[in-house]
Amino acid sequence: MAIESSEPMNCFINYGVLFLLTFALEVFGGSEDTQVLVYDARVGFLSAGTLEVNMTLSKGRYELFGDVRTSGAIERFFRWRGKFAAVGFMVEEMPRTRAYLLFEERKNSRKVTLAAHGKTTIHRLSGVSREVEYPQGSDLMSVLFLTDHCFDAAWVHDGEDAYEVVRTASRQTFVKQGKTHFRGSTELCRYRFNYGKAEQRGLDVWLGLHRDRWVPVRIRVRVPFRPDALLRLRTPG
């Protein structure tokens, strides 16, 4: 059951910094392997923005930071920016989230979601905050960017709600994405994303070898009756 509070929202930045100092920095101090991935986004035929992911793996632990922002033609319709951070452990080659932070900003609203210690706290610009039960599984961003193989099924969450992801097919393929994006052999993982009680989406992830690690080099989200969303990994030209 949600717990609501009328606490003022003047703690946005401090709350995020507290999270990073408490959880992420203890992993960063032992960093042995850090990688930065930059993706260009499209929705249908429209340029939609960029996603930057910074991830560090060290002795079975990980930290993940990301920045998503819209730009280009899509901003004629909407504008959105998000930052996320996650820390956790790798268990049987899959990430297990210990804590997850998401900051979202739209034209007239801001929202901070912090999932840690068995509960999720959600803050809004309106000054109303609430607590909900920690969702099942690991956060979607950790599973998406730190899993280097096609998995059969997993529960993922956005800090607030949990969703089941089930593999429907996989195969070897070769992708060509232009001179400035990844080109090469990949493994295509096709998933069914159970989003809500009756809604399903398609999630296609192409895994390719980039700087000695298998990472998503192309990601496509398929939503019925809507244009596909596509992410393509940038590579040096």
Predicted regions and their residues:
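Hydrophobic, well-structured mid-protein blocks that either form specific transmembrane helices
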Residues: 107-148
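Bacterial N-terminal signal peptides that target proteins for export
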Residues: 6-16
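Acidic, serine/threonine-rich low-complexity disordered tracts
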Residues: 28-116, 151-237
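N-terminal signal peptide c-region/cleavage motif recognized by signal peptidases
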Residues: 24-26
